[in-house]
């Protein structure tokens, strides 16, 4: 299995509900390493850049408004097949359809307040992490 990195962002609903520690603990228990971690309040411009692939879709404005409504916690995780592993751990976008045991299945309130975002491909990772981190903020091997 290839060692790779993925970008993860705990959305404002997850931060406000005090789920940050539990979510990070799940990733660490799965053997993923935190390579970068940051809490911030996204600007509209940053949110639009992060979700650029959804521009023009009916939900784009609501999504941007939601992720700029409170602080988020962004991180880069590294591990074997990290992108696939994290996507399986978080569950489908619609938390109502996410199975119990997944992050969204356990914590999402609806399709919008679904607690977490994660890259779905290497290309997404390369684009998304740059909204939050410069390369010199990513920790090397430890």
UniProtKB/Swiss-Prot annotation:
One of its GO terms (molecular function) is nucleoside diphosphate kinase activity. Its main location: cytoplasm. Transmembrane segments: none annotated. One of its GO terms (biological process) is UTP biosynthetic process. Its EC number is 2.7.4.6. The keyword Methyltransferase does not apply. Its cofactor is Mg(2+). Pfam families: NDK (PF00334). ATP binds at residues 11, 59, 87, 93, 104, 114. Keywords: ATP-binding, Cytoplasm, Kinase, Magnesium, Metal-binding, Nucleotide metabolism, Nucleotide-binding, Phosphoprotein, Transferase. GO terms for cellular component: cytoplasm. The active site is at 117 (pros-phosphohistidine intermediate). The keyword Endoplasmic reticulum does not apply. SUPFAM superfamilies: Nucleoside diphosphate kinase, NDK. It is found in: Cytoplasm. It catalyses: a 2'-deoxyribonucleoside 5'-diphosphate + ATP = a 2'-deoxyribonucleoside 5'-triphosphate + ADP; a ribonucleoside 5'-diphosphate + ATP = a ribonucleoside 5'-triphosphate + ADP. InterPro entries: NDK-like_dom, NDK-like_dom_sf, Nucleoside_diP_kinase, Nucleoside_diP_kinase_AS. Major role in the synthesis of nucleoside triphosphates other than ATP. The ATP gamma phosphate is transferred to the NDP beta phosphate via a ping-pong mechanism, using a phosphorylated active-site intermediate. Belongs to the NDK family. This is Nucleoside diphosphate kinase. It comes from Hyperthermus butylicus (strain DSM 5456 / JCM 9403 / PLM1-5).
């Amino acid at each position: 299995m290839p060692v790779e990195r993925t970008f993860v962002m705990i959305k404002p609903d997850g931060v406000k509900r005090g789920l940050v520690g539990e979510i990070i603990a799940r990733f660490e228990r799965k053997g993923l390493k935190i390579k970068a971690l940051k809490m911030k309040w996204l600007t509209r411009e940053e949110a639009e850049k992060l979700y650029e692939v959804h521009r023009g879709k009916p939900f784009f404005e609501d999504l941007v408004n939601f992720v700029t409504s409170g602080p988020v916690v962004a991180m880069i995780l590294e591990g074997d097949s990290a992108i696939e592993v994290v996507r399986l751990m978080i569950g489908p976008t619609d938390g109502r359809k996410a199975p119990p045991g997944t992050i969204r299945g356990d914590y999402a309130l609806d399709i919008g307040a679904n607690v977490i975002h994660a890259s779905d491909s290497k290309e997404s990772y390369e684009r998304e992490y740059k909204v939050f981190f410069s390369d010199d903020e990513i920790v090397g091997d430890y």
